[in-house]
Amino acid sequence: MALTLDIVTPERRVLSVTVDEVRAPGAAGGFGIRVNHEPFMTALEPGRLTYVEGGREHHYAIGGGFLQVAENRVIVLADTAEAAGDIDVERAKRAFQDAQDRLLRMTEQDEHHPAESARVKRAAARISVAGR
């Protein structure tokens, strides 16, 4: 028996595959899911989502979202999702630097602070996943 993993963004279904294990960056910390996991739902932070298929690891950078587990099916509703091999590292580094520069010029009370902070986290996740 295996898990079905679906990764969906607002733009498209990114992935639908049968896997052995899923590891994801939860809001309360990283966690793993295997066959017959208890049903649950959680918020996701920007970071690395890894799945294992036939003993081989595959990595995605996700920009936050939600994950639901039920009946050996894992559904990821992600703001963004990008396979490690599809990430333009130089573009991600520029996005990280630009967002970090903007963030450093703001106070935490600035209305744009949360959005810039999220951009920094997403860009950092993309760089980390691409470097694997």
UniProtKB/Swiss-Prot annotation:
Provide this UniProt record's keywords sorted from A to Z: ATP synthesis, Cell inner membrane, Cell membrane, CF(1), Hydrogen ion transport, Ion transport, Membrane, Transport
The family classification in the record reads: Belongs to the ATPase epsilon chain family.
Task: Tell me a GO cellular component.
Answer: proton-transporting ATP synthase complex
Which NCBIfam families does the entry link to? Answer: ATP_synt_epsi (TIGR01216), PRK13446.1 (NF009980)
What is a single Pfam family found in this protein's UniProt entry?
ATP-synt_DE
- In the UniProt record, what gene is named as encoding this protein? atpC
> What membrane topology was assigned to this protein in its record?
Peripheral membrane protein
Native organism:
Anaeromyxobacter sp. (strain Fw109-5)
Q: What is this protein called?
A: ATP synthase epsilon chain
